[in-house]
Amino acid sequence: MKTQIKIIIFTFCLFFLHTYSYAESNQRIQQRAEFKKALLAANQKDWESVRESQALLSNYPLSYFLDYLRIMDNFSNTSPQTLLSFLQRYGDSAEGEKLRRKWLYVLAKEKSWRLYLRIYQAQKSIVLQCHYATARLITGQARQAALHDVKKIWLTGDSRPSACDPAFSYLYNSSVMTNKLLLERIRLAMKKNHLGVAQAVAKHLPPQYQAWADHWFTMHKNPLTSLNNFTLRDTYTAREILLHGLHRLAKTNFEAAVQHWEYYQQRFNFDAKQWQDFYLNLALYSVKAGRSDRMRWLLAVPAYGLEHEKLHRTRFKEALKQQNWRALKAFYADLPKKDKDSYRWKYWYARALEQLGEAGYAKVIFTELAALRDYYGYLAADRVALPYQLQNHPTQYTRQEGQAIRNHPYIERAYEFYRLDRLIDARRAWAYGMKRFSKSQQAISARLARQWGWYDRGIFTAARAGAYDDVDVRFPLAYRQAITRGARHQKIDLAWTYAIVRQESAFMEKVRSHAGALGLMQLMPATARLVARKQGFSLANNKAILDVETNVDWVQGIYNRC
């Protein structure tokens, strides 16, 4: 009897749990419908109807979004108390971040510095950072710390917005500002060829430094004349000015720059770094100008261990163009240790060894690279006839970890926006959350997005998390039926089609590029109309281009005829 009672109770519990789960799911569906209704009312500025809907959405993850829309619709007339209340409750959201940023600009314009300080959180905007510093300086809050923060913003070769001028004025009139700092910013500005910035800073120099600055500015404007009439004695600053002129001259008169270098390097004590900088720039200028002797200048750079991606990339590219394997081998020897471990440089080093008769050593490197799931790993595998390695290792996590991510407010908001087809809001909510998640949380989120069919977020988030071995997330076989049908119809390789889709749209079926290309395979409207005419019908609008089957079939057909 007891056993029967236990079975009945167990069965009832299962039924109850199933019914509860169904009711909760049904409740969420009803909430989405009510939220859509509220959005329509918000678009019509019917805020009374919005409030009525909101009363039914108290535990819905996006209920706050209706408050946000109401506030933004009448921002200038919204009380500070209402804004503060929203930020206190929903400040940790994409909308909260946007509202905070908008309010900070308004408060700065009104010079409401104490309220500005109250709501400020770290911002990327230099303007808002400068306003923050100004607010602290005016109110006397942590004055010295504020001045040092201003110094960090000020010390750059770039121009800064006028919003920074009040804070900079405090800096110029403080003990934090020194002649050494002024000279350093002039150096940074001249290095970037920002003459106007350097001249503006130079106005704050005492008279004894003005001549130094004037020499540099004159050299910048007319390097050839200045180099012909250079009279400064040998100091570090004089050598800086000379090198600036030589770099400027090399762009327009390469031979004259070389001649002046040969003259001045015998009379001035340039250090190793200055030698390196001169030859590095000369080499890059020679390549840009397409000079026939560019390989000579690339080889002349004293580049051992130099961390300069552009130089190394240019050297390898030129060596490959000229099939100069000996030069390529020498270039590899100059790489910093971390770059020598790069799959790309290792592969080309092995190719150079192979061409120079060192096949045994080359094979060792190719075999090592062939074990990797990487473009150069696959190229290496081809060299030694080894199979490609996919190395699919899905992100591992517990059920509890997965549930914690799924129930996190960041993810709940993004998911609801996604289900409502509000993709811009969904991506914004997702991006906000991913910036704040750890790498492991991001990797779990990527798998979650993949499970939902939100393929592009899965791809981008897995890459951000460094989950490179989670292959089915990074390379999903999405829209398989449509893509396979199109590939068969147009006699196009299926793998090639998937590669194009992933590269062009990351499986975003409604994506539109800056150039106007649409859909999975990024079809231009003009091309689509041409294809449509050839097939005997016209396109009323671009909506048909976004249809997955149409987009895939037409683009595959175009490539098939190429």
Where are these regions (language model features)?
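Catalytic glycan-binding domains that act on GlcNAc-containing polysaccharides
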Residues: 59, 68, 259, 263, ...
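Structural motif corresponding to the intra-repeat A-B loop/turn of tetratricopeptide repeats
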Residues: 44, 73, 77, 106, ...
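Residue-level signature for tetratricopeptide repeat
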Residues: 40, 69, 73, 106, ...
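Bacterial N-terminal signal peptides
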Residues: 8-17
